[in-house]
Design a protein with these regions (language model features):
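Bacterial N-terminal signal peptides
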Residues: 4-14
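Extracellular polysaccharide-degrading/modifying enzymes targeting complex plant/algal/animal polysaccharides
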Residues: 22-265, 270, 285-304, 311, ...
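Predominantly extracellular beta-rich ligand-binding scaffolds that present long acidic/polar faces
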Residues: 109-120, 139, 375-512
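Extracellular beta-strand/beta-solenoid scaffold signature
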Residues: 139-155, 207, 239-245, 263-270, ...
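Right-handed parallel beta-helix
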Residues: 252-263, 275-299, 305-308, 313-366, ...
């Protein structure tokens, strides 16, 4: 997306709308026209991302090849003719910094890619981007599904890595995961999604609702409610098992480029404290939903997780650019860390973070960040944090609607005001924040910098599009109160920068 194209498109849409709409409805008509223009621009941008050409490999760089079509794990992996076939074989290789790992286009590589420091992972050949699937297999086989004593509940033996969802026919439909809420006083157990009593798969009662008995003494089976054998009902069934697509850990100097990551229960790319992580020209779809842990945060139900690209910890030189993330349980991109009290004054700065030229669609949060400081005197902060030239749509909608906290989705999410999010040189510019299930943004910090300066971002030339009366969210250092989206939003946003435009769609029709 050109640096000035977003503002130009929105200006043109507003002018054409005002010329064609009734005087009483000019503003909302302009908002709808602008939204339509931006969705068209995003569709074209997605086509460009998917068609990104292969990256050039430097002469003399150690290079390894994987091919689902012709590869063999007993080969040496050093040429296209002697390519490996699986991510499991790649995991056994010792890769030197400066190496390149090339996945053949058109192939599907199942399992986690374990990343080595200083290595670039990208594509070769022709056709669609190579696909990294966390799903161990396609479950559209009637013989693998067994009818239980409940005639509408079918069992599939998937093992004990928790399944975050099942995706049918490439995303035409998906399953709703049932987790159990346990009343702390009575011990009674309930379906967290419906509120009805629930003790086992026998209590499933909604089409494509499922429960996974992943517990240590459980069966390891997924139980899915369906009137018909799922293997007959669907052409493909993929499982978001509890794993990453790429497991970076603390590896420095990693580039992940030109791949598609799908059907993982945790993160598409999961990293800890690291430096020089670059993610470019990638697509992420159907990410997350697996259980992080039971009973954390004082909850009486399990907590689920799943981001397309995550660093949990400190970082320096972290870039995500020219990517498309859609249908993500948590965040499209994120850097985050809760600094433990035992860290004392140890710094976990997040420096030189840039999210640019991406398209986010139906992620609970398009961009999420937090840097929570629990120890007085810890000076950790975000520095040179830039969010620019991104197109963001429908936060909190889609797959993530099965979350228990259905009022927290936002395009930028920082979890409000508190002992968190100290920031210097934080810039949000030339983005489109379009529609959300709840609020557009939640940007907060309760910490100043050492020189007394604000941790709030500068907002420049962004476009906000929301419905009248719905939540705008907040941008604040002092209050977690959320503001409604309406006539006063423009003046509020103008306090944080110039050139921003707030366009208002008409209020949604009430369901009878």
């Amino acid at each position: 997306m050109k640096a000035n194209l977003l503002a130009l498109v929105c200006t043109l849409a507003a002018w054409t709308a005002s010329a064609a709409c009734p005087e009483s409805n000019t503003a909302s008509c302009a908002a709808q026209r602008t939204l339509d223009e931006l969705r068209a621009q995003a569709a074209a941008r997605i086509v460009e991302i998917r068609a990104t050409p292969n990256r050039a490999v430097p002469d003399g760089a150690p290079t390894y090849y994987l091919s689902e079509r012709t590869g063999r794990d007993d080969a040496d992996g050093r040429t296209p003719a002697t390519a490996w076939r699986t991510a499991a074989r790649l995991a056994r290789a010792k890769l030197a910094p400066g190496s390149y790992v090339l996945f053949e286009r058109g192939g599907v590589y199942r399992g986690t890619v374990k990343v080595a420091p200083g290595v670039t992972y990208t594509a070769y050949g022709t056709g669609p981007k190579p696909c990294i699937y966390g799903s161990p297999e396609d479950g559209a086989d009637p013989a693998k599904w067994t009818r239980t004593e409940n005639p509408n509940v079918w069992a599939y033996d998937i093992g004990r890595r928790d399944v975050g969802t099942l995706v049918f026919d490439g995303g035409a439909q998906h399953a709703t995961k049932i987790v159990i809420r346990t009343d702390k006083k009575t011990g009674a157990r309930f379906n967290k999604f419906t509120g009805r009593p629930f003790n086992s798969y026998r209590d499933l009662d909604g089409d494509l609702h499922f429960w996974h008995d992943y517990y240590e003494k459980g069966t390891g089976k997924v139980y899915l409610y369906s009137a018909q054998n799922p293997g007959e009902r669907f052409r493909s069934i993929e499982f978001n098992v509890k794993c990453h697509g790429f497991a970076v850990g603390g590896a420095d100097g990693v580039t992940i480029d030109n791949v598609t990551v799908k059907y993982v229960g945790v993160h598409g790319i999961g990293a800890g404290t690291c430096r020089d992580l670059t993610v470019s020209n990638c697509e992420f779809g159907w990410i997350g939903g697996s259980i992080q842990a039971e009973g954390i945060f004082g909850r009486d139900y399990p907590t689920r997780l799943g981001n397309a690209v995550e660093i949990y910890g400190g970082c320096e030189n972290y870039t995500v650019t020219n990517c498309y993330a859609w249908q993500v349980y948590d965040a499209g991109v994120t850097q985050q860390f809760n600094i433990p009290e035992k860290a004392g004054a140890k710094r976990y700065d997040q420096k030189n973070v840039r999210y640019a030229h991406n398209v986010f669609e139906k992620c609970n949060y398009s961009v999420e960040y937090f840097l929570t400081v629990r120890t007085k005197g810890n000076a950790s902060r975000m520095e040179n944090f830039v969010v620019e030239d991104n197109l963001m749509f429908d936060a909190g909608l889609g797959f993530c609607e099965q979350r228990p906290d259905r009022n927290e989705g936002a395009h930028i999410k920082s979890w409000g005001v508190g002992s968190n999010n100290r920031a210097k040189n934080y810039v949000i510019r030339r983005n489109a924040f379009c529609c959300a299930g709840d609020m557009l943004v939640q940007i907060g910090s309760g910490l100043k910098n050492a020189d007394g300066s604000s941790s709030m971002p500068t907002l420049t030339d962004n476009v906000f599009i929301g419905r009248a009366g719905q939540s705008f969210g907040l941008i604040s250092e002092t209050s977690n109160a959320r503001a409604a989206y309406g006539a006063g939003t423009q003046a509020f946003v103008d306090r944080f920068g110039t050139g921003n435009r707030c366009l208002i769609l008409p209020a949604a029709a009430q369901t009878p």
